[in-house]
């Protein structure tokens, strides 16, 4: 159960980096104005919405929850790495579909999480998960904005590699998750 709570914290914390740093980074890296920043965030939101609405079910059915989570982490990590080194703003729009693969990770994790405890403990478990998400929403913006301001003069894209590093912490946790009966049956 603890690995699932930590994963929720990691995924929530990394999600905070976008809202905290995206506009500053776009302005610093590409001299984007408000319209360009808004268009990029809008494209990001549309891709994420479509991915979360259309991909998790088929991905979990095809790959299983653990692999779907890992595909989500891999897609986001690849996109963030491209963003870190991107030399032109159009590259960010081009990578959005890959970025959207991250949209399958959290729904797969949520599905897996509901089977980690019995029915009688669901309320308590959901409360613990909500607390982890709340803690991430407090800690992550402070951490990522501080790191951004330390690195923005030398390399604004460094912030995205720091997010990849945090996602990297999730991989061994995902690999170590115990599969419950439903996923074992689906993989057979």
Residue ranges of model-derived segments:
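Intracellular juxtamembrane helix-capping segments at the cytosolic ends
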Residues: 104-118
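Structural signature of the two symmetry-related core transmembrane helices
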Residues: 67-82
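A late C-terminal transmembrane helix in Major Facilitator Superfamily
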Residues: 122-150
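Multi-pass alpha-helical transporter architecture, strongest
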Residues: 161-188
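Helix-loop junctions at membrane interfaces in 12-TM secondary transporters
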Residues: 82-96, 105
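Short amphipathic helix-loop junctions that connect adjacent transmembrane helices
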Residues: 20-37
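Helix-to-loop junctions at the C-terminal end of transmembrane segments
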Residues: 51-65, 148
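A membrane-interface helix-boundary motif in multi-pass transporters
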Residues: 146-167
């Amino acid at each position: 159960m603890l690995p699932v709570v930590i994963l929720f914290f990691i995924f929530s914390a990394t999600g905070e980096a976008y809202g905290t740093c995206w506009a500053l980074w776009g302005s610093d890296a590409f001299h984007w104005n408000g319209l360009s920043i808004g268009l990029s965030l809008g494209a990001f939101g549309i891709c994420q919405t479509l991915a979360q609405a259309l991909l998790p079910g088929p991905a979990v059915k095809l790959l299983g929850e653990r692999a779907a989570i890992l595909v989500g982490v891999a897609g986001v990590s690849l996109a963030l790495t491209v963003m870190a080194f991107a030399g032109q703003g159009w590259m960010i729009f081009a990578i959005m579909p890959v970025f959207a693969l991250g949209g399958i990770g959290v729904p797969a994790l949520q599905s897996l999480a509901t089977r980690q405890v019995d029915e009688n403990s669901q309320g308590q478990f959901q409360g613990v998960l909500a607390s982890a998400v709340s803690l991430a929403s407090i800690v992550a913006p402070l951490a990522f904005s501080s790191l951004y301001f330390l690195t923005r003069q030398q390399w604004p894209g460094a912030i995205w590699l720091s997010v990849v590093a945090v996602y990297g912490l999730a991989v061994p946790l995902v690999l170590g998750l115990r599969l419950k009966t439903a996923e074992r049956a689906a993989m057979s």
